[in-house]
Amino acid sequence: LKLAYRDKYLRENPNDFLEKIESRDIHKEFLTQDELKTLASTPCDIPVLRNASLFSCLTGLRISDILNLKWENLCTAPDLGHCIRLRTQKTQTEALLPISYEAYALCGEPGTGKVFKELRRCMTGYPLKAWIKKAGIQKHITFHCFRHTYATLQIAAGTDIFTVSKMLTHKNVATTQIYAELVSEKKRETVDKISLK
C-alpha cells in the first residue's frame, strides 16, 4: 500500500488512518549459564533428547531444523571449523553457521541420514519437562527456550547483536534486539563462550 501511494495509484495513504499497535512486553524464558551447566550434568532418560537440547543451546537452532538436520549438512570450513550448512525451515534462509567442537560432539558418530535419528517432537513435551524438573530448574522451559538461551548467553558474553542475528538466521536485527534487552551485562566473546562444562 505504501508503494501504491508513493507511485500515485492511491490519493491517500491508508496507513494514515490506522492506529499504531502498541508492542507488548514479551517474556522470553531462558536458562542462565549455571542452569545450562546443571542441565548438562543432569542425567536424561532419553539420550537423544539431551543431545538435541544441548545442541540447540549451543547453536540456537530451532526444533524444526534439528529434526531435519542431516549429516550432509555438517561440514568443515577452512576459516570457520565445524559448520552447519542448511536452509532453515521457518524462514527458508540459506545459512553457513559455525558451531563449537562441543556442539559437534553432541551429534555423535558421523553417519548418514538424520543426525538426531531417534528424536521425535513428542519428546519435547513431557520427557523434556521431566528432565528439567530432575535438574531442579524452576522455570517453564520449552524446547524453543533453548534458542532463547543461546541468544541471551551470546549477547551476555559480549557477542555483537549483528552476529547473533546472523547466527539465528533472523532476517531483521530488530528481532534479535529483544534478547539484548534481556541482558544487563556483557562478558566475553564468540562461539566457545557457551559451555556445558
List each language-model region with its residue ranges.
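Short, polar N-cap/turn motifs at the start of nucleic acid-interacting alpha helices
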Residues: 73-80, 138-139, 159-178, 189
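DNA/chromatin major-groove-contacting recognition/catalytic segments
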Residues: 38, 95-98, 105, 109, ...
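Active-site/catalytic core of tyrosine-dependent DNA strand-transfer enzymes
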Residues: 98-138
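Catalytic-site neighborhood detector that most strongly recognizes the C-terminal catalytic loop/helix
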Residues: 30, 88-92, 168-193
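Conserved tyrosine-mediated DNA breakage-rejoining catalytic core shared by Y-recombinases
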Residues: 17-35, 68-107
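Basic, Lys/Arg- and aromatic-enriched nucleic-acid-binding interface segment
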Residues: 6, 10-63, 67
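C-terminal catalytic core of tyrosine-transesterase DNA break-rejoin enzymes
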Residues: 54, 58, 65, 147-171, ...
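Residue-level signal for the short linker/turn that defines the boundary of a DNA-recognition helix
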Residues: 50, 61, 141, 158-159
